[in-house]
Amino acid sequence: MKKVFIPLVFFFCLVIFLAIGLNRDPREIPSPLIGKPAPAFNLVTLESDKTFSPEQMLGKVWMFNVWATWCVACREEHPVLVAFAEKNQVPIVGLSYKEIQPQDPAAKQSDAIKLQVARERSAVWLQRHGNPYTTSVMDLDGRVGIQYGVYGVPETYVIDQQGVIRFKHVGAVTPQLLAEKILPLMQGLGKS
């Protein structure tokens, strides 16, 4: 009797754990950064050699969107961000992430040339698809992405007035996500 019972209990436990895992949304990856200050960085902007730091956004609720011209999902979410930026007075800061990939011919060039190529590609892409960003910064080597725990692009963060990360979304932002989670959160943070 025990020989049949123990494997049967083990099997049912395994099925329960698998069912729980399959019902979770993979885009809702828990981030250890939620509730903690946004990692500091200082990167050059897409527009000029001026630099941007999250400290410049203290006192404002803002979105931080990690994107790349080579990212297919970024193309899907981009019209949503453009429409959101037109309707809302919320700053969106873009992080152009690893624009120069290792297999890219520009990867063998100097850092200055890589930056120039990345800026040109990003600027052309934003001209073609619209620019929802208050500013966009260049993360050529992906170090800032690592600090933010980026799993892949696109990723979007909501950061409050004190510079604390309040929300992280992995994957394309949809109108439904904006309406149901991001906008209510940002409005609530704006009142506090």
Place the predicted regions along the sequence by residue.
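Conserved redox-active cysteine motifs that mediate thiol-disulfide chemistry
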Residues: 66-83, 97
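Short, internal strand/loop/helix patches
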Residues: 111-158
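Short pre-active-site segment immediately N-terminal to redox-active cysteine/selenocysteine motifs
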Residues: 60-62, 66-70, 99, 152
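A short beta-strand-turn-helix
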Residues: 41-63
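Thiol-/selenol-based redox modules, centered on thioredoxin-like
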Residues: 158-192
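Hydrophobic beta-strand anchors of alpha/beta hydrolase catalytic cores
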Residues: 63-64, 92, 156
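N-terminal targeting signals for export/organelle localization
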Residues: 1-42, 191-192
